Amino acid sequence: MNFTDTLKVQTSLSGGYDEDGNPIESIFQWILFGKEKNSIIFTNEKAAKVSLNDGNEYVYSYVIIAKLKKDLIPLIPREGQKVHIHKSDGTIDKEMEVKGFVTLKNRYLKIWV
């Protein structure tokens, strides 16, 4: 596989509550998942569906395949988390919500957005 696209994961740097119990607003930051050109982005041209954990089927917009290494496991985006995808040819540059993910042979991560 020729990995030419980029995947970034949105993570929260802070949040929680202050000493009076008031919520502290979270600050979000984009973290590169691995390195530049670590993923491949495919469009869902056939309106295929994926079954989610809640039992519903979802017609996804894109599927992303990314290289997975041990040090990237804490960065795996969870359902509902935002990711930023960028296709190397410039046709896709979007912020999307993760609908589901799986790991493949402990070497790759497959994400539906």
What are these regions (language model features)?
Residues 24-113:
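Short, conserved turn/kink motifs that form compact alpha/beta structural patches or helix kinks used as
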Residues 1-31:
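Active-site-proximal polar cores
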